Design a protein with these regions (language model features):
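Low-complexity repeat regions of mature extracellularly deployed or surface/particle-associated proteins
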Residues: 1-196
Length: 196
């Protein structure tokens, strides 16, 4: 039996955050011309969690099989965010920008881009292949929970996540997450099992 499985957990628990400083993350002209697997994470802010997971397996034989499974958990619980007066001459702005990146890829690409606090993003892929097999199964599932989040703002929250001129000419699978703000949860799950 060829089995590929991804099990992943992301948790933000009981964090206390006082935001006064700006935060920036930028990608430009990156991750191009790749054959195979590409995992890209770009984050600006605080307590952001990002993951790219890939599991691949193969087998051969008349009594073999192929199984692929993805399971995930994302949990934000008991977090307190305070957006206070910025330091003099600055702002509490949080920016994550991606430009002219992740292009001309053959294979699998998982991309996460986040600006803010407590954002959770993940791209999971499980691939299983068996030749002359008698069985193929694929499954994907999980849980996302936001609970007990407290936000205090003395100024407007200023977060921007932008993607321009990117993710072009990709052959295969693409999982893309783009988020700005607080406690956003995003998942792309792909589970494939094949016999031939």
């Amino acid at each position: 039996m060829a089995t590929a499985r991804v099990d992943d957990v992301q948790k933000n628990l009981g964090n206390k955050l006082n935001v006064t400083d700006p935060a920036n993350a930028a990608m430009s002209g990156s991750v191009t011309g790749i054959q195979g697997n590409a995992g890209v994470n770009n984050a600006s802010g605080f307590f952001n969690q990002q993951a790219n997971n890939v599991a691949i397996t193969s087998a051969s034989g008349k009594k073999s099989g192929a199984a692929a499974a993805v399971s995930f958990e994302q949990l934000n619980d008991g977090n307190t965010y305070t957006f206070a007066q910025p330091l003099y001459g600055t702002s509490n702005k949080m920016d994550a920008t991606m430009s002219n990146s992740v292009s001309n890829i053959q294979g699998n690409a998982g991309i996460n881009n986040a600006a803010g606090a407590g954002n959770q993003q993940k791209d999971d892929v499980a691939l299983s292949s068996a030749s002359s097999a008698v069985l193929a199964t694929a499954s994907a599932g999980g849980t996302q929970v936001n609970h007990g989040i407290a936000v205090t703002t003395f100024l407007p929250i200023n977060g921007t996540a932008s993607i321009t001129g990117s993710v072009n000419n990709v052959t295969g699978n693409v999982g893309l997450n783009n988020a700005a703000g607080l406690s956003n949860q995003q998942v792309n799950s792909l589970s494939v099992a094949a016999t031939h």
